[in-house]
């Protein structure tokens, strides 16, 4: 959520920023919220004037009674004042709800360093690590490798649940579990994050706090009859751990790493990368979440991105980092990096992590603040998160980049201690 004061003071600037994002944004929302804000402030002034008049008349009643004079006229006037105040209170509540409705639908303001552009083709490559894997034999896609090795069962996943669900079997399941533990160990032991195991269902307030609702409700799995949502990422429960709280500045930055299953309807992605493990309705992920002081947030974003990169370096998987352009930035981020791993079957890099600084956008929605040294006026915190990284896509990348001509797959050395020193899947 943006600062309403900034919109009030610079409505035309905000309109231009929204148009430059490349999204289909209705600038009338800005005009409407400015008008509602003006009406809100008018109501507050009028209510204060009415209350002042009522207090003045209330003090006169005592004097009139002492003097034995008639108070009926002034009592009637006070009743009218009270009725008018109640009417304004009702209108104020209505105006506040309308303001909230609009504010929840206005996207974040991009950082000045976000490049111009409309699609992912306009994203800017920042750096690469490793070289794309080359083979001297005809390589296979991970869905064929997994099926041939009998470690991934797409057919039975479809029978059990439907398209874009997968059953991991035998060494496939063990590989997934090994990756989860490797990622968590690196982030907690080497990078200093505190591990969190969060609920996989959250309420509407939590989904609203991190920005999934109301805009992306069609992409969420909702549990009917009780208002719960299956989490699309551990970002949601971990960020909302601190909803409506005031943190101590001495405790910042707070760094959490959370493994969870993730659930996404992906309503707008029909036909996109739907084979294999790249785009599933249910998948596992280790998420990194930070709560930091505003002046530290962009340094912390660089550190978070490096932390996510480290797990790919440890696995020897070639990747690149791109800075996301305005049109591809999404609703909540002020600046975002994507980490893309090399996938031979696609002959291109594929997103495996997004690392974002939301500045105070989520904190305003979730009302997360801090006090410097635990004292003074509370200020909104900055929140950051990033995938550290997606597990299923890591499995896919390992199967494709570490495949051998005989159909086996070499297990990356870093994972072998988690797989009882097994070195090959065959």
UniProtKB/Swiss-Prot annotation:
Keyword DNA repair assigned: no
Biological process according to GO: selenocysteine biosynthetic process; seryl-tRNA aminoacylation
Molecular function as annotated in GO: ATP binding; catalytic activity, acting on a protein; serine-tRNA ligase activity; transferase activity
Enzyme Commission number, as recorded: 6.1.1.11
Keyword Protein biosynthesis: yes
Pathway: Aminoacyl-tRNA biosynthesis; selenocysteinyl-tRNA(Sec) biosynthesis; L-seryl-tRNA(Sec) from L-serine and tRNA(Sec): step 1/1
Binding site for L-serine: 233-235, 287, 387
Annotated compartments: Cytoplasm
Chemical reaction(s) catalysed: tRNA(Ser) + L-serine + ATP = L-seryl-tRNA(Ser) + AMP + diphosphate + H(+); tRNA(Sec) + L-serine + ATP = L-seryl-tRNA(Sec) + AMP + diphosphate + H(+)
Gene3D superfamilies hit by this protein: Bira Bifunctional Protein, Domain 2 (3.30.930.10), Serine-tRNA synthetase, tRNA binding domain (1.10.287.40)
Any matching Pfam family: Seryl_tRNA_N
UniProt keyword annotations, A-Z: Aminoacyl-tRNA synthetase, ATP-binding, Cytoplasm, Ligase, Nucleotide-binding, Protein biosynthesis
InterPro entries from the UniProt entry: aa-tRNA-synt_IIb, aa-tRNA-synth_II, aa-tRNA-synth_II/BPL/LPL, Ser-tRNA-ligase_type_1, Ser-tRNA-synth_1_N, SerRS_1_N_sf, SerRS_core, tRNA-bd_arm
Binding site residues for ATP: 264-266, 351-354
Signal peptide segment: none
Cellular component annotations (GO), alphabetically ordered: cytoplasm
Description of how the protein assembles with itself and partners: Homodimer. The tRNA molecule binds across the dimer.
Family membership: Belongs to the class-II aminoacyl-tRNA synthetase family. Type-1 seryl-tRNA synthetase subfamily.
Stored NCBIfam families: serS (TIGR00414)
Main function: Catalyzes the attachment of serine to tRNA(Ser). Is also able to aminoacylate tRNA(Sec) with serine, to form the misacylated tRNA L-seryl-tRNA(Sec), which will be further converted into selenocysteinyl-tRNA(Sec).
Free-text note regarding domains: Consists of two distinct domains, a catalytic core and a N-terminal extension that is involved in tRNA binding.
PANTHER family associated with the record: SERINE--TRNA LIGASE, SERYL-TRNA SYNTHETASE
Name of this chain's protein: Serine--tRNA ligase
Source organism of this protein record: Clostridium novyi (strain NT)
The encoding gene: serS
